[in-house]
């Protein structure tokens, strides 16, 4: 079957830059979905997206649908006709369903059958509907109307190109009649641009100063920004989201180096970077030591004959913003950091839980408690806790919310606070996302854990649990943050005790009954989710959770040991044996003796098992106490043979009550040795 290239380009006013790439991807996805539904084959398809256009190019698209055969089976012949040969309602109903007379139905087989070959339709007649459906399904939160038209789209449409091979696909979509006239760069080439063929689309527009390929523009910007940064003896900060946004703002990118006064470098560089990136869409430059250089890169959308005018204009625009940051920084430093707590006495953290200052007091107390137990400095943790929210009341954070914690660090350093105290003011918010950086200091870790536990306990304590996708206080992230800090920083904290301490600090503000257990269950459920994401079998998690270790670090060490144990050849048999032992002991009606009486071991197999368990117990106990759980389980794996022999040769429930009870005691010792690490009966 013959095939042609197909191109559709919808021209618009400037599209939302943050959504441009996703709109292009969705446009392509919708068209591919429509082509597949129509049975139209093609070789490849890709999208193009620029500020004023969305386009899709489909290579080697079939010019016509393939013919298809409809084959429908109807009722059996004996049900289709009565004894006189007259058609029944079943036969007539089947013919009606097929849309034909009964005479056109095949009666040669055991059932009525309708066979029809339907000729494929030309692709050119199907493409307008496919394109329109794709545009209607684009993920646009709010569509707009323009002029006196009823059509709706994300932005007013300006032109439409639809070519199938060399021919225009005649149609009208979103108030635009299809043609082959596109438009060039708004300033360099504002006239119409004739698209000679779908394959020539990119080059035709390139000649009109438009790079329609989003990926090409993105790569060009990234490369040129890196080159210019190197020329300035620096490196550029290029967040992927900023690069995407800048790519979506320009059709013909021209990166240029600009500068600002060095006096602004006295302001925290994070504030300068924030305002230049978020407000001006600039790429900031750092020196080899990670310090901000007094230069930045802007990406112009025009190749100017006087680029110095563009540079000068951007420098004038950024100066007031940097001046504002400088002013806020100087104003905030005029008073001690702790004095900002007075403002926080009137700022509500949560209506039922009190003010932000009260939260800082609780965090201070809990951070000191935690620091003592993880080897940190309780006094410094307490100090960091009481200062932890002060910067929320500063001018700097009021203008730049992203500076919370960071501003606190600079103001604490300016005020002569200990380095770990200052760092903790920023580290309290760590990790700021999945896989993000963790606190570098014990003081920071203590404050971060305290802050998150205080939020968890408080919000749970007033019954505002997260439901489904709703988690306004980010409790899931808080729980995962606590777990990451304690596990990845190797901090051995009794979380049960810490949560109870957090509950006590709230007093009568929360309903304390069962609160600690509720919070702990939530946190350890997050740990289960973390392991699932890492590919750990849920049975491994459950085998450890059954023992309810109170320290997340201890919990993780056990999980890693069980993971290793499962790889051993003895694991499956020992897991099954433990499950059998668990069932036997659960059904015991008699009290199980605490110790094994060697004189009551009668059979050779039980004597061998008794000796093996006793030897293993003496070796495993110190290993488990030292938390060398992997070595402990490896040692217990040697019990497989005597365990298998015991169950093969020995009957546990014998008539002799003393012997029976002694065998229960032996099995309890066996199970207890494994329970020092995990309940491996759950691995079956």
Curated annotation (Swiss-Prot):
Top-level lineage group: Bacteria
UniProt keywords, alphabetically: Aminoacyl-tRNA synthetase, ATP-binding, Cytoplasm, Ligase, Nucleotide-binding, Protein biosynthesis
Subcellular location(s) of the protein: Cytoplasm
Any one of the GO CC terms: cytosol
Keyword Chaperone (UniProt): no
Chief location category: cytoplasm
UniProt xrefs under Pfam families: DALR_1, tRNA_synt_2f
Enzyme Commission numbers on file: 6.1.1.14
GO BP annotations, alphabetical order: arginyl-tRNA aminoacylation; glycyl-tRNA aminoacylation
InterPro entries, sorted: DALR_anticod-bd, Gly-tRNA-synth_bsu, Gly-tRNA-synth_heterodimer
Keyword Methyltransferase: no
Reaction(s) this enzyme catalyzes, per UniProt: tRNA(Gly) + glycine + ATP = glycyl-tRNA(Gly) + AMP + diphosphate
PROSITE patterns: AA_TRNA_LIGASE_II_GLYAB (PS50861)
GO molecular function terms listed in the Swiss-Prot or TrEMBL record: arginine-tRNA ligase activity; ATP binding; glycine-tRNA ligase activity
SUPFAM superfamilies per UniProt: HD-domain/PDEase-like
Family label: Belongs to the class-II aminoacyl-tRNA synthetase family.
Subunit structure, interactors included: Tetramer of two alpha and two beta subunits.
Record-given protein name: Glycine--tRNA ligase beta subunit
Species of origin: Pseudomonas aeruginosa (strain ATCC 15692 / DSM 22644 / CIP 104116 / JCM 14847 / LMG 12228 / 1C / PRS 101 / PAO1)
């Amino acid at each position: 079957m013959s095939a042609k290239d197909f191109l559709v380009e919808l021209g618009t006013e400037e599209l939302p830059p943050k959504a441009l790439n996703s709109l292009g991807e969705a446009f392509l996805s919708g068209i591919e979905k429509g082509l597949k539904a129509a049975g139209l084959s093609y070789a490849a398809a890709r999208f193009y997206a620029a500020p004023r256009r969305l386009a899709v190019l489909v290579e080697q698209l079939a010019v016509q649908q393939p013919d298809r055969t409809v084959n429908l089976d109807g009722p059996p012949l004996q049900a289709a006709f009565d004894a006189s040969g007259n058609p029944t309602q079943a036969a007539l109903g089947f013919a009606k369903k097929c849309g034909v007379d009964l005479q056109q139905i095949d009666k040669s087989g055991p059932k009525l059958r309708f066979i029809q070959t339907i000729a494929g339709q030309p692709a050119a007649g199907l493409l307008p509907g496919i394109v329109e459906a794709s545009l209607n399904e684009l993920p646009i939160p709010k569509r707009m109307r323009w002029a006196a038209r009823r059509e709706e789209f994300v932005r007013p449409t300006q032109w439409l190109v639809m070519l199938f091979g060399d021919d225009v696909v005649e149609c009208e979509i979103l108030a635009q009649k299809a043609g082959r006239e596109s438009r060039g760069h708004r300033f360099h080439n504002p006239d119409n641009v004739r698209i000679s063929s779908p394959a020539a689309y990119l080059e035709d527009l390139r000649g009109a100063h438009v790079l329609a390929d989003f990926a090409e523009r993105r790569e060009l910007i990234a490369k040129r920004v890196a080159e210019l940064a190197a020329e300035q003896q620096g490196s550029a900060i290029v967040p992927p989201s900023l690069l995407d946004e800048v790519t979506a703002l320009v059709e013909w990118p021209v990166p240029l180096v600009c500068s600002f006064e060095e006096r602004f470098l006295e302001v925290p560089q994070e504030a300068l970077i924030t305002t230049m990136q978020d407000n001006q869409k600039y790429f900031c430059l750092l020196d080899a030591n990670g310090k901000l250089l007094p230069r930045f890169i802007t990406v112009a959308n025009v190749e100017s004959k006087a680029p110095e005018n563009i540079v000068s204009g951007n420098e004038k625009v950024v100066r007031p913003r940097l001046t504002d940051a400088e002013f806020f920084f100087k104003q905030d430093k005029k008073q001690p950091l702790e004095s900002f707590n007075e403002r926080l006495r009137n700022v509500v953290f949560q209506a039922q839980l009190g003010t932000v200052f009260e939260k800082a007091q609780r965090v201070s107390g809990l951070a000191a408690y935690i620091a003592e137990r993880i080897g940190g400095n309780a006094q410094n943790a307490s100090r960091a806790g009481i200062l932890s929210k002060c910067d929320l009341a500063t001018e700097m954070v009021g203008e730049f919310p992203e500076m919370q914690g960071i501003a606190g660090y600079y103001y604490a350093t300016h005020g002569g606070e200990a380095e770990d105290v200052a760092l903790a003011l920023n580290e309290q918010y760590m990790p700021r996302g999945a896989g993000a950086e963790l606190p570098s200091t014990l003081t920071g870790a203590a404050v971060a854990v305290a802050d998150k536990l205080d939020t968890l306990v408080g919000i749970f304590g007033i019954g505002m649990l997260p439901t489904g996708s709703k988690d306004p206080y980010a409790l899931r992230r808080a729980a995962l943050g606590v777990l990451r800090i304690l596990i990845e920083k190797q901090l051995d904290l009794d979380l049960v005790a810490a949560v109870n301490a957090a509950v006590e600090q709230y007093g009568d503000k929360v309903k304390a009954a069962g609160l600690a257990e509720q919070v702990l269950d939530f946190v350890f459920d997050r740990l289960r989710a973390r392991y699932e994401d890492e590919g750990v079998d849920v049975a491994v998690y459950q085998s450890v959770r059954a023992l309810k270790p109170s320290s997340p670090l201890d919990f993780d060490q056990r999980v890693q040991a069980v993971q290793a144990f499962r790889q051993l050849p003895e694991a499956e048999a020992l897991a099954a044996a433990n499950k059998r032992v668990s069932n036997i002991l659960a059904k015991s009606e008699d009290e199980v003796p605490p110790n094994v009486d060697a004189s009551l071991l009668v059979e050779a197999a039980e004597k061998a098992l008794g000796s093996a368990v006793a030897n293993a117990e003496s070796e495993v106990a110190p290993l488990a106490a030292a938390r060398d759980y992997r070595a402990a389980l490896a040692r217990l794996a040697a019990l497989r043979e005597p365990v298998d022999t015991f169950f093969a040769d020995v009957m546990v429930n014998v008539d002799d009550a003393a012997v029976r009870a002694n065998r229960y005691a032996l099995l309890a010792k066996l199970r207890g040795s494994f329970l020092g690490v995990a309940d491996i009966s759950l691995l079956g």
